A protein has these predicted regions:
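Short linear, low-complexity motifs centered on an aromatic residue
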Residues: 96-112, 131, 229, 236-238, ...
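Histidine/acidic residue-rich metal-binding segments in metalloenzymes
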Residues: 13-120, 124-140
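Active-site-proximal loop/turn and secondary-structure-junction residues that shape catalytic pockets
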Residues: 67-71, 91-93, 121-122, 169, ...
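C-terminal amphipathic alpha-helical interaction region
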Residues: 525-729
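Active-site proximal loops enriched in glycine and acidic residues that flank catalytic Cys/His/Asp
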Residues: 67, 91, 119, 296-298, ...
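Composition- and surface-driven signal marking solvent-exposed, interaction-prone regions
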Residues: 232, 308, 330-331, 357-361, ...
């Protein structure tokens, strides 16, 4: 194995950047060329078929079988112009990845000749095996049927020689088995609820859209080094490795010069993204060595989520071409920053109003304040649901580690905006307001845009921060499907807005004027949600104590965090807003707990294998060298001098012996703990057992191995070290 390490380093020394040729100097010449967007639809579809698609997207009008056949034929003609040979229903099962089965267009004609055909039936629906994907017990092998159904709101696209059709994935009995189905439901729920509230201010608003801008962080490592690290290959993270003498302490990597090989990779990635209509705009070095970020312009949340899933797949494929491996794990290296995926979330009306941006007049600012205050209450009431949506084995290594937001949910608004809310709460009277009081309030509200101009500072320790015209949810992990967080946020927002509107209508029924009713409910909501507002250092120990006194929860135990999906509040949101039914919600919880269990189980097995088969033998080899050295010293030096000269080597032999013994003993204990957990029939008990009795061994065994790495001859150490993984360019 040590030979493989040095071969990898030698191979890396000979790497050169690949030449990447841009299709055209003009981005617009090839942007969206591989997407069946409206421009291509207009060219390849008859007018009536094009109208059927646009009506389905904008109004939800069903597409007839006749129109589906016309659309499928036009889609096939467009795809053939790009040399496509196969098509697939592209969907997002509960695996944090995507799935696809490629079928050719080949069919037999009536006379037995081979023809190429793509019908509306094949476009609209297919039947993959639902039992082979995570399903929480909904589907068994003997009842395996599931359906994929075309999501007309997300355009088809071509990757290499395959036409990919975005679809939802449901069981034969109708339960959702993917991320897209509940995401579409959550977006529809917040659309309706937000539109109803908007119409209290502006009857011209008939729809509200959810926008998402994700920021994808990732690490790159040379493929030769990656292949020499079995833990990276099998788990996505290093299960052992002593910190490099230099890591990120000089803060010289963030926004630094991008290495040429990485630039070539980024350039090709951007070209492929632009062909697929993914509006990537920003690329830069991140804080940790060999860590980078890619970010697009925001889009409709459903399309943005599809694009993020596609980007993660593109990254892996293009990285291989450039002799890299892309690491999307939240914490691939201990001791340096991990990777997240910030979700920039906003709501926008069909009249062009960003509901999280101050308006141009008091009326517009009232609308802004209404939605701002409802976000505060939404997060306060649903902190456990939001945490559950981002809880995972990988993300738990990152959250609360002085590099990412803590597991405590709070909102940062900035002092100026917080003081405005406090002033509104102070000025609004509990009794009937006078005309003068209303005027004073409206004048103060009218000043919001000038107050907020360049005053919304950035608090990097806040998990849910207002950044001027959007909220940035920073707790999501880099490998996660954005849909999980977007489902929770939008469903919770829909529920909160519905409650807000009901409260206002109740006051209006009692004879209170609309404006005054809005002011009163805003005051109540501002006061009730005050504990969720925090402007300070989210990393500090003082905040943990203060958060507890405010009634905010701090759950770092992953299975416990996931169990909050079944709390009354989470159920009232997810089931009450019809995002999930009882069966689907129970299925989600089971899948997430099983996923957590399997990831810890794999890490445990890999660590045990590497420890016993690679590290311990290396330690024994070096120990034998030391013993041979002692024998040589005894032969040369007189006893008294020998004792002095050999003392340090004896101590090192003793140290290595103790650590080898500890490693073997703890691997044995970890294996026994795993066996006990594996015999548990209840998936909840199993997840808790892995968290509490198996996972602690990962750190304790690692500590011994990392110390051995610093004691054993570098020439025989079997695995690439952190300095090589992080600093070889």
């Amino acid at each position: 194995m040590s030979k493989m390490r040095f071969f990898a380093l030698q191979e890396l020394a000979n790497r050169r950047p690949l030449e990447v040729i841009t299709p055209s100097n003009k981005l617009s010449d090839y942007y969206g060329s591989h997407v069946f967007d409206r421009k291509n639809m207009q060219e390849y579809l008859p007018k009536e078929a094009y109208k059927a698609v646009t009506d389905a997207i904008e109004k939800g009008t069903p597409i007839s079988r006749e129109m589906a056949d016309l659309i499928a034929n036009g889609m096939k003609s467009w795809a053939k112009s790009l040399n496509v040979t196969h098509y697939t229903h592209w969907f997002q099962p509960l695996t944090d990845g995507t799935a696809e089965k490629h079928d050719g267009f080949i069919e037999f004609g009536e006379d037995g000749d081979v023809i190429e055909r793509f019908s509306g039936k094949l476009l609209i629906q297919q039947e993959p095996d639902a039992s082979s994907f995570p399903n929480g017990g909904i589907r068994n092998t003997f009842e395996a049927r599931g359906y994929t159904a075309w999501d007309v709101s997300s355009p088809a696209f071509v990757v290499e020689t395959t036409l990919c059709i975005p679809t939802i994935f449901i069981s034969y009995t109708g339960e959702a088995l993917d991320y897209k189905t509940p995401l579409l439901k959550a977006l529809a729920a917040v659309d309706k609820a937000a539109t109803d509230v908007c119409q209290l201010f502006d009857k011209n608003i008939t729809r509200v859209y959810t926008n998402l801008g994700w920021e994808q962080e990732y690490f790159l490592v040379d493929s030769a080094l990656y292949n020499a690290r079995p833990d990276l290959c099998l788990t996505g993270r290093t299960l052992m490795g002593h910190s490099s003498a230099k890591d990120q302490q000089l803060e010289d990597h963030y926004f630094g010069s991008i290495p040429p090989r990485v630039t070539a990779f980024m350039k090709e990635l951007e070209i492929e993204c632009h062909k697929l209509g993914i509006p990537v705009k920003t690329r830069h070095n991140e804080v940790a060595p060999n860590q980078f970020e890619l970010a697009p312009i925001f889009e409709n949340a459903n399309l943005a989520n599809d694009h993020n899933q596609l980007v993660m797949d593109l990254m892996k494929r293009i990285a291989r071409k450039h002799n890299f491996a892309v690491l999307l794990h939240e914490k691939p290296y201990s001791g340096v920053n991990g990777s997240g995926k910030h979700n920039n979330w906003s709501l926008c009306t069909d009249t062009g109003i960003n509901l999280f941006a101050p308006g141009k007049n008091p009326k517009g600012n009232m609308l802004f304040l209404t939605f701002l205050v409802n976000v505060l209450m939404m997060v306060y009431k649903n902190q456990d649901l939001l945490r559950a949506s981002i809880a995972s084995a990988g993300n738990s290594y990152r959250l609360g580690a002085n590099e990412a937001p803590p597991a405590i949910l709070s909102i940062f608004l900035g002092k100026q905006l917080s003081s405005i809310l406090d002033e509104i709460a102070r000025q609004v009277s509990n009794s009937k307001m006078t005309a003068e009081e209303k005027t004073t309030l409206k004048l103060g509200i009218g000043r919001i845009p000038e107050i907020l101009l360049d005053t919304t500072d950035r608090n990097r320790t806040s998990p849910f921060a207002f950044t001027g015209n959007r909220f940035e949810f920073r707790a999501a992990g880099s490998s996660a499907n954005c849909a999980a967080a977007m489902i929770a946020i939008n469903a919770a927002m829909a529920s909160q807005l519905n409650e807000f509107k009901i409260s206002i209508e109740k006051l209006m029924e009692e004879g209170v004027g609309k404006d005054e009713a809005i002011f009163r409910i805003l005051k109540e909501t501002i006061i009730a949600s005050e504990p969720i507002r925090f402007e300070g250092d989210g990393y500090s120990e003082q905040w943990k104590q203060e958060a507890a006194s405010r009634g905010l929860t701090n759950i770092c135990h992953v299975p416990q965090a996931l169990m909050r999906y079944m709390d009354n509040q989470a159920r009232s949101v997810l089931i009450g807003e019809r995002i999930f039914n009882e069966t689907e919600l129970a299925c989600r919880l089971e899948v997430e707990l099983e996923k957590y269990t399997m990831k810890v189980q794999i890490e445990s097995r890999v660590l045990g294998d590497l420890a016993i088969n690679h590290i311990v033998p290396t330690a024994v080899i070096y120990q034998n060298r030391l013993l041979e050295n002692l024998r040589g010293l005894r032969e040369i030096f007189p006893p008294e001098e020998y004792e002095v000269l050999s003392a340090d080597r004896k101590e090192l032999i003793r140290e290595i012996s103790h650590r080898v013994t500890a490693i073997k003993m703890q691997v044995r204990e970890m294996t026994e703990a795993r066996k006990v957990a594996n015999h548990m029939n209840n998936y909840k008990d199993k997840a808790f057992a892995y968290e509490e009795t198996v996972r602690p061994y990962l750190e304790s065994i690692r500590e011994h191995i990392d110390n051995l790495e610093m004691e054993i001859d570098d020439e025989i150490w079997p695995l690439p070290k952190y300095r090589e993984l992080l600093f070889t360019k």
